[in-house]
């Protein structure tokens, strides 16, 4: 294997592909990146068994001799990042010993034989649909934060993707809050899958420009085609809970308020709240709306929500300040609407007269 390549082109590809590498993998070979130098380009592959990423570089490269090797992800990435010059020369000089040279640097890096690297099926099989990459990225950013951090219910550690009747619905919940974003799609297909949070996190870092991405959904995996990148991820087994009642029950009491004003009030009210629970209380009536918090050790604070408009019977409700702030940022509109049913029932947060992004927060019992 012998080639010259633009350093920044290689660095960008290695940075993205290395997102699939786990340095704690029980298989030492999977702590590396596989280099396959073919006649028409360089193929880079990495995997941790749960997610695999592959890309092909065919620009900014001069191929001198084809071949393959597996190089440590940690070291090859740091070498290419810190080495000088615009062009890098990489050559396997003895067995798997790989020499990386630039204008003033020479590194000899021990590699591994490429046939020890597991074979990864990146064939484009399964149900197919396409969408704009920025739409996909937006959906993930508006739902991913609501996934569970607890492994006791693995299905809640991912995002539920449902497609039916030309509609994509993405749902995430940790049982204390819920995020649901929907959008129309052109493809006439049906599926209901759960994609791991980790995989989605890696995918949104690969998306850099607005282009069409293709998804191929199978029973146990889904393949993303993003430009020159192929991302294969396993799916989470299990049935995602039915959350339709939470988003259908809009509530008869509503409050509309400027998003920035409420975020500011939440930030100030949570200054004196308990650091662990971060609970605040919202007291509402048609005449006055107050956000407050209390800590026996620290003190108390009250915020008068002068820009809020409330319709309904007087009500007091307590909840996590962080959860509501996350929901408001996800909605992203200038004005939001909060919809309530009862004091201890989940309440909704939406944009005003918009229902393509529905956030739900569960109240808590407090002082």
Short names for language-model regions:
Residues 1-367:
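Structural preference for solvent-exposed beta-strand-turn elements
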